[in-house]
Amino acid sequence: MDLSKAYDCLPHDLLIAKLEAYGFDNDSLQLICSYLESRYQRVKIGSCKSTRRKIKIGVPQGSVLGPLFFNIFINDLFLMSLESEICNFADDNTIFACGNTIQEIVIKLENDLGLLLDWFSKNGMIANPEKFQIMFLGLSDQRCLRLNIEGKKLPATDTVKLLGIQIDNKLKLNKHIHELCSKVNQKVSAFARLNTYLSPDQATKICDTIILSNFNYCPLVWLFCSDAANDEINRAHKRCLRVLYQDFESSFQLLLSRDNSQTIHVKNLQKLMTEIYKSVKKLNPSYLWEFHERKEVTYDLRTKDLCKLPKIKKRYGSESLSFRGSLLWNTLSDNIKQSPTLAAFKNQIKSWTGDKCTCRLCL
C-alpha cells in the first residue's frame, strides 16, 4: 500500500494525543511539543524568498526521533480487527489473505482495504490506491483479476516490488536477480572505462564498495535461487574480476583465487551461518530465534551446539532457510560453532568454503 510522504503528513496535535493516550506524562509531552512546534519553512527561487509559514504537520526528516514518532503514531493501525494479516516496515504496509476460493480472498482484501483507507484518511495520511500493488500467488494468469478499491478496479500483476525485492506470483526471484545483475553489469562497463586511470588499490575499493556491494542487499532472501539465476550472478561476478585484473583469459576459479575471495553464493552461506550463530547466542531479535533453535540436551554432549531440523513435507521446504540453514550449521566444526564472540565467529567463518553444503547450487 503506497503512502505519499508519510513522514511529512503526521498531524502534530493527533501525535501528541496518541502519546498522551499511551501514557506519556505532561513534562514529556511539553518537551515533545517544544521539539515539534516553532518550526517554519519558506521557498527560495533565485533571489526571491516567500514568507515563512509555520509547519503544523510532519516529523523532522533525518532525526532519530522521527521514525520513533511515526511508529508510535501508526501503532494503533495494527489493533484493528481485520480478516487479513498486515505486515509493516516503517511506512511500507502489506496485507495478505488466504481462502478456499479466489472470490473469498477478493472479498476479504476489499473489505480490509476499505477499513485501512478509512484509517489513513482519519489520521491525516494520504494513500494512493492507484499505486497499490496486487498479486495472487500461484495463479499463472492474473489478467482477469481485479480489486474494487474506492470505486476503481485495480488489476493484479505477476510481480510486485516489496522493500526493494522483486517477487513473482510463484515466489520466484529470477526477475529480481536479473535486474540486480543488469545493474552490476552497467557499473562494470563504466568501471572498465575508468580502470586504466586508477591505481590497483583504488580499483579494488571501487570494485568492492560500488559494484559487488549490490549483492549485499537482502542476500538471504535469494540465497537458494535457481541454477540459471546463480549462473547469471557468477557471470556478472566473473566479468567484474576480469575488468579489475585486466585478465580476460583465466577461468572464474583462477580469478577468485587471485582475488582471494569466494563466489557470491559461498559468501551468502557465510552470512547465513553468521545469522544462525546470532540466533543460537540470542544476539538478534527474538522473533528470529524460532527459525534456528538449538537441540535440547541434558548432558554435555557433542550435539549440544546442533540445531533442530524442522519437519518438512515437500521438496520446497528443503530449500527453506530454516531447514537448509540448520542442516548446514550442523556440519560446521565445533571450533567454529563454539566461537566465544561474534567477532571471533566472523573471523573464522571467512575461511569456510561451505564444502559440505548439499543444496543444489553446491552439488
Please provide the spans of the model-predicted regions.
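Short, conserved catalytic/metal-binding micro-motifs enriched in Asp/Glu and His
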Residues: 2, 19, 32, 62, ...
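Active-site palm subdomain of RNA-directed nucleic acid polymerases
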Residues: 67-97
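Amphipathic alpha-helical
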Residues: 285-324
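Basic, alpha-helical interaction scaffolds
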Residues: 155-221
